[in-house]
Amino acid sequence: MKQYLDLMKHILDKGTDKSDRTGTGTRSVFGYQMRFDLNEGFPLVTTKKCHLRSIIHELLWFLKGETNVDYLHENKVSIWDEWADEKGNLGPVYGAQWRSWPTPDGRHIDQISQVIEQIKATPDSRRLIVSAWNVGELDKMALAPCHAFFQFYVADGKLSCQLYQRSCDVFLGLPFNIASYALLTMMVAQQCNLGLGDFVWTGGDTHLYSNHMEQTQLQLSREPRPLPTMKILRHPESIFDYRFEDFELSGYDPHPHIKAPVAI
């Protein structure tokens, strides 16, 4: 994951100091891209320990179409707690948009089911897209989508995915986002009987929070270790039938965890 450290260094060296919604302050760059060949290992950051349980359960939660944190709590995941209301609701965030995008005529579109069928039927389509950025419902969401839009691409029997992330907390959020979408790409590839291509991450406002600078320097002082391997142990009938125990990570030998505050 040298690419990740290179991004951190680029922000420190070339970034602009900016104010932000949370009042914390950031150093930011605009427009950055990284590419990960999913055949060369699972792109999970090794220069600090990442909480894989949270990454997997959050993805399964998105795929369930759920927008209440109850499922996350049942599985000891608390990463959405700061934004939930007293009943655990978040409004129509990722899961709602992925699985039940409302249309003006009263229908609801399951974008995940739709894109998988499109990949199978028309793999060369340039419309293999899922969007969480529903302008008509942004004001109902506890947090506007940061990872807003992703597109699949099939070539030579391999599936690739590109994510556009309009806003990126590089220290805390980005390691989760990369691993989550890499895993989603693996799952969709399995469902469509395709090999693995690349995961391409594209960032808009790509930033380090001002209260993450010490942690960033510590992480930059560490040498990246070999990437782990992720295996999917079962082939469920549907993208919606995966369980936590279907995923096996091996060879993950990270440096120790680095704690940092979340900007809310």
From Swiss-Prot:
Homodimer. It is found in: Cytoplasm. It catalyses: dUMP + (6R)-5,10-methylene-5,6,7,8-tetrahydrofolate = 7,8-dihydrofolate + dTMP. Catalyzes the reductive methylation of 2'-deoxyuridine-5'-monophosphate (dUMP) to 2'-deoxythymidine-5'-monophosphate (dTMP) while utilizing 5,10-methylenetetrahydrofolate (mTHF) as the methyl donor and reductant in the reaction, yielding dihydrofolate (DHF) as a by-product. This enzymatic reaction provides an intracellular de novo source of dTMP, an essential precursor for DNA biosynthesis. It comes from Shewanella amazonensis (strain ATCC BAA-1098 / SB2B). Keywords: Cytoplasm, Methyltransferase, Nucleotide biosynthesis, Transferase. GO terms for biological process: dTMP biosynthetic process; dTTP biosynthetic process; methylation. The lineage of its organism: Bacteria, Pseudomonadati, Pseudomonadota, Gammaproteobacteria, Alteromonadales. This is Thymidylate synthase.
